[in-house]
A protein has these predicted regions:
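Conserved N-terminal beta1-alpha1 strand-loop-helix module at the mouth
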Residues: 1-91
Length: 91
């Protein structure tokens, strides 16, 4: 996916995803100002992260936003995310 240099906001998810989060995310992405979205769920189970990631991946794809998973290459690969953010301690 090509990066649009006119829109370069990088959003990071909250640690907990509420039921209203998806609508809020859609409303933000509709503004066409975001290039990247990083899913960062440190305390959720793998199963729950997978379910959330699949929903958010579809939303990001619709709005042509690069979708990244935080600290979980296995999950990133499973949902076919655009990438995985790894901190220095994770390498």
């Amino acid at each position: 996916m090509k990066i649009n240099k006119k829109k370069f906001l990088y959003l990071v998810s909250p640690n907990k995803i509420s039921k209203h989060f998806y609508k809020d995310l859609i409303d933000i992405l509709k503004l066409n100002k975001v290039s990247f979205f990083q899913l960062r769920l440190k305390k959720e189970s793998y199963k729950k992260k997978l379910k959330i990631a699949e929903k958010i991946k579809k939303i990001c794809k619709k709005f042509k936003v690069i979708f990244l998973i935080n600290d979980d290459p296995k999950l990133a690969k499973q949902v076919n995310a655009d990438g995985c953010h790894l901190g220095q301690k994770d390498m």
